[in-house]
Amino acid sequence: MDFSNKTALITGSGQGVGEGIARALASYGANVCLVGRTLSKVEAVAEDINQQGGSAIAIECDVKSNESINNSIEATISKFNSLNILINNAQE
């Protein structure tokens, strides 16, 4: 699969399934925006993806807040100039 020039926003990507999806998409060339309630978790995953040659950013986001969601989308588009894939993985 080739996801070059595609950008994905993955909620709940600081651990578990969301982290796995983010890592897989990055390995196929996608820019990934890791979104989660705990910034330190998504930052750690983003840093590792970047160190492995991928392109990732981390954003703290509460998916129960429209403002927080909008800020995450705006930050993703600002960084990567697009948003092509949305993975809704966040859970309580």
What is each PLM-predicted segment?
Residues 25:
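Aromatic pocket-lining residues of Rossmann-like dinucleotide-binding sites
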